């Protein structure tokens, strides 16, 4: 602990280290991903631009909970988080804390900012944070280091994660549309794998592990095999 996170030295008896675990700022990642695909020649269109995608040859729907009216069983799991700021604590990696009810973590960001998250509540409400959640998140930060008790609360965030009953992602072909959904808490982690499966399915006609076919008139996809 002293070598990895000096500011936490002496505060905890035991900890586990995962040297290859990475973290990112999802907002920055979205901007960079959009710039990347535009630089590769793709065009980005948005609903407010009046773009009509109904005439596209292939449509992939990855809108999360916004597709719930089309996908039976897709539910929302609410998540709440805080961004706090202090110059009194320095962390170089995410720190996860054991919690009796929810897995809490604190992720360092630039300029003394830390993201504290995240709750898991069976609800599709996405507009407010509860007092209980606020207390739990702040208590977790304070338990990690008392200096967080004097931190500035910069932002309060709430939204919902799309999930099916088993909390596993799925690729569904329905009404001519490919739906990639149900990534739950693991959107950025699983998105590359689902994108690969979708490409293999559309281009190579291979059936991915997570595929559910609801268009009965389609030709069957060949079962994907692992090398």
Where are these regions (language model features)?
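Flavin (FAD/FMN) cofactor-binding and adjacent substrate-gating region
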Residues: 1-35, 39, 163-164
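A conserved short coil-to-beta-strand element within the FAD-binding core of flavoproteins
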Residues: 4, 22, 42-55
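A short, glycine/Asx- and small/polar-enriched loop/turn
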Residues: 5-12, 53-57, 163-168, 173-174
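Short, histidine-centered active-site or binding-site loop motifs used for metal coordination
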Residues: 17, 119-122, 183
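Short, hydrophobic alpha-helical segments
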Residues: 40-44, 145, 198-206
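Short hydrophobic core segments
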Residues: 55-65, 195
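Active-site substrate-recognition segment that forms the wall
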Residues: 63-175
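C-terminal catalytic lobe of FAD-dependent flavoproteins
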Residues: 151-227
């Amino acid at each position: 602990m002293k070598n990895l996170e000096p500011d936490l030295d002496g505060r905890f008896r035991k900890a586990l280290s995962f040297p290859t675990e990475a973290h990112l700022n999802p907002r920055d990642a979205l901007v960079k991903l959009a710039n990347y695909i535009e630089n590769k020649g793709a065009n980005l269109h948005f609903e407010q631009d009046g773009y009509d995608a109904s005439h596209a040859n292939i449509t992939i729907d990855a809108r999360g909970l916004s597709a719930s009216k089309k996908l039976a069983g897709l539910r929302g799991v609410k998540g709440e988080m805080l961004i706090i700021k202090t110059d009194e604590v320095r962390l170089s990696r995410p720190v996860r804390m054991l919690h009796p009810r929810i897995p809490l973590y604190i992720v360092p960001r630039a300029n003394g900012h830390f993201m504290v998250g995240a709750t898991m509540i069976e609800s599709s409400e996405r507009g407010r944070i509860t007092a209980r959640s606020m207390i739990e998140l702040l208590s977790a930060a304070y338990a990690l280091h008392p200096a967080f008790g004097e931190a500035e609360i910069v932002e309060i965030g709430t939204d919902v994660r799309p999930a099916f009953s088993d909390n596993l992602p799925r690729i569904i072909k329905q009404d001519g549309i490919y739906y990639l959904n149900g990534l739950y808490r693991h959107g950025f982690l699983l998105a590359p794998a689902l994108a690969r499966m979708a490409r293999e399915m559309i281009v190579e006609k291979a059936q991915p592990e997570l595929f559910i076919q609801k268009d009965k008139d389609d030709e069957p996809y060949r079962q994907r095999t692992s090398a």
